[in-house]
Amino acid sequence: MLDRIKIALQHLLPKVWLTQLAGWGADRQAGMLTKLVIDLFARIYKVNMQEAQQPDTASYRSFNDFFVRPLKPGIRPVDPLPNRLVFPADGAISQLGAIDDDRILQAKQHDYTLEALLAGNYIISDLFRDGLFVTTYLSPRDYHRVHMPCDGILRDMIYVPGDLFSVNPLTAANVPNLFARNERVICLFDTPFGPMVQILVGATIVGSIETVWAGVVTPPREGIIKRWAYPMEGEGAVILEKGDEMGRFKLGSTVINLFAKDRVQLMPGLASQSVTRMGEAMAEALDEDILARMSANDDTDTTP
């Protein structure tokens, strides 16, 4: 009964207004009041401040500064093996596995299509038919910067307006097409492992979604799909390395990764609800050509 009430409230509450209010409040610099709010939040959600570059909560001017806090250098080592991709964020796996033609599992008895997730872009959708996906949920206690699973060159960024349902196991199991309905930022990369999509999904009280190359992508929420294309090289190119920060959430939410067919395989033992840490191995190369190229690069590496 309680779950039904929670889901009903998700449909009834003015989510955009609440999100705007939360974003406004989280940006306020209110001195001791800000510190009290941060201390209360850290206590309720058991945030490990010893991992933060600034463990003293008084050092954060606003709640958002605290929420996107950087970690101490080296606290999240990135798996060094060149044939491995790493988790982009701290959190827990919501779902993962094979894409069934164009259908992605959201929760038991719920799925959604690639085209719906990718805002109707059938060209990008076709790249990932029968591929693999990983959905990572970031809880309030987690580190909320998002990193690159592997080296990548950005080709497209697409902002998709949408709903702002909360994202958690309850809504995933009860709100159809949750990730294809919520506001999101889609990033398509060329990588050594073939095309890869990394999607930052918004939610209720997610004040903003940012990328390192474009800054704040949302807000403003203008209600229209926006697309930016990027060159492979030269001025305007966005070239990132494995483990580099690529974006961040201010209050939220979920990261979805898509991989092309027969390019990578997920690491053994991963399952729904597995805890993730940025930099730990998520998948490894499956394509023999990729492995051969990586081996050749290692053989010619002259680094002392």
Curated annotation (Swiss-Prot):
Listed pathway(s): Phospholipid metabolism; phosphatidylethanolamine biosynthesis; phosphatidylethanolamine from CDP-diacylglycerol: step 2/2
Active site, per annotation: D90, H147, S253
Oligomer and partners: Heterodimer of a large membrane-associated beta subunit and a small pyruvoyl-containing alpha subunit.
Site features described as Cleavage (non-hydrolytic), chain residue numbers: G252, S253
Summary of the function given for this chain in its UniProt record: Catalyzes the formation of phosphatidylethanolamine (PtdEtn) from phosphatidylserine (PtdSer).
Cofactor note text: Binds 1 pyruvoyl group covalently per subunit.
The keyword tRNA-binding appears for this protein: no
Cofactor(s) this protein requires: pyruvate
Protein name, per record: Phosphatidylserine decarboxylase proenzyme
PANTHER family: PHOSPHATIDYLSERINE DECARBOXYLASE (PTHR10067), PHOSPHATIDYLSERINE DECARBOXYLASE PROENZYME, MITOCHONDRIAL (PTHR10067:SF6)
Membrane topology: Peripheral membrane protein
Main subcellular localisation: membrane
Record note on modification: Is synthesized initially as an inactive proenzyme. Formation of the active enzyme involves a self-maturation process in which the active site pyruvoyl group is generated from an internal serine residue via an autocatalytic post-translational modification. Two non-identical subunits are generated from the proenzyme in this reaction, and the pyruvate is formed at the N-terminus of the alpha chain, which is derived from the carboxyl end of the proenzyme.
Alphabetically ordered keywords of this record: Cell membrane, Decarboxylase, Lipid biosynthesis, Lipid metabolism, Lyase, Membrane, Phospholipid biosynthesis, Phospholipid metabolism, Pyruvate, Zymogen
Protein EC: 4.1.1.65
Family recorded in the similarity comment: Belongs to the phosphatidylserine decarboxylase family. PSD-B subfamily. Prokaryotic type I sub-subfamily.
Subcellular location: Cell membrane
GO biological process per UniProt: phosphatidylethanolamine biosynthetic process
GO cellular component, one term: plasma membrane
